[in-house]
From Swiss-Prot:
Extracellular side of membrane: 29-45, 97-235
Keywords linked to the UniProt accession: Glycoprotein, Membrane, Transmembrane, Transmembrane helix
Function: May be involved in the regulation of cell differentiation.
Lineage of origin: Eukaryota, Viridiplantae, Streptophyta, Embryophyta, Tracheophyta
Transmembrane segments: 8-28, 46-66, 76-96, 236-256
Name of the featured protein: Tetraspanin-8
An annotated GO cellular component: plasmodesma
Length: 273
């Protein structure tokens, strides 16, 4: 059993080591080949994750297979902190994504999104001007609205209203239905200058391709709807990852006890069993 737990920890950490290689390579590739600032923004976190997994895996591998007790202790301490971190992140993700959803519009295939429907913490992230300028730049570079226009440019208004748009397309690429603007094409609308609008997005809308509704509250809400969906998926993956970490940690504790017992035996009898 002693050998089994040490060998199992070694095998699991060898698999983690193999996993860290493509993650690290992907981060390096992004830093060198990323065509936009948004793509390059991910390189440092990905590289850091790859290096972290590699170092932890090597520590666990050496500590268990070579029976280096102090190194295995450090490995288990880091694993314990990682389990706490993943648990807290998972709970936090569920808490901040429990609010907010698109609002169905009568007679329309798409939904519209309001910033106030989402959690206060998420709202503060996008209402920060510095944060939003970076996000806005990424949205423009992704050509989310240009692709929408190219896809539906010749579609008549009645057909366009029946389309199922994504949260970003609905929030960033067209004005709110409350504005009552006249449809020309998916990203070009004629403003109604005679009416008064309570929705501030109606004044923010601009037909210029680099502006559109990228500064609208609806665009920020559309982004948060995407974030909400993504975080819920990440939280589910985190639960699986957490179970894996707990299993590895438990087996690692067995290996640590084995190492301590062997060290004690060695001090008493002069050799390891």
């Amino acid at each position: 059993m002693a050998r089994c737990s040490n060998n199992l920890v070694g095998i699991l950490n060898f698999l983690v080591f193999l996993l860290s290689i493509p993650i690290l390579a992907g981060g390096i590739w992004l830093s060198q080949k990323g065509s936009t600032e948004c793509e390059r923004f991910l390189d440092k976190p990905v590289i850091a994750l790859g290096v972290f997994l590699m170092v932890v895996a090597i520590a666990g591998l050496i500590g268990s297979c070579c029976r280096v007790t102090w190194l295995l202790w450090v490995y288990l301490f880091v694993m314990f902190l990682l389990i706490l971190l993943v648990f807290c992140i998972t709970v936090f993700a569920f808490v901040v994504t429990n609010k907010g959803a698109g609002e169905a519009i009568e007679g329309k295939g798409y939904k519209e999104y309001k910033l106030g429907d989402y959690s206060t913490w998420l709202q503060k992230r996008v209402e920060n001007g510095k944060n939003w300028n970076k996000i806005r730049s990424c949205l423009v570079e992704s050509k989310v609205c240009s692709k929408l226009e190219a896809k539906f440019v010749n579609v008549p208004v009645n057909s366009f209203y029946k389309e199922h748009l994504t949260a970003l397309q609905s929030g960033c690429c067209k004005p709110s239905d409350e504005c009552g603007f006249e449809y020309v094409n998916p990203t070009t609308w004629t403003k109604n200058t005679t009416g008064t609008h309570t929705n501030p997005d109606c004044q923010t809308w601009d037909n210029a391709k680099e502006k559109l509704c990228f500064d609208c509250q609806s665009c920020k809400a559309g982004l948060l709807d995407n974030v909400k969906s993504a975080w819920k998926k990440v939280a589910i993956v985190n639960i699986v990852f957490l179970v894996f970490l707990i299993i590895v940690y438990s087996v690692g504790c067995c290996a640590f006890r084995n190492n301590k017992r062997d060290d004690s035996y060695s001090r008493t009898y002069g050799y390891k069993p």
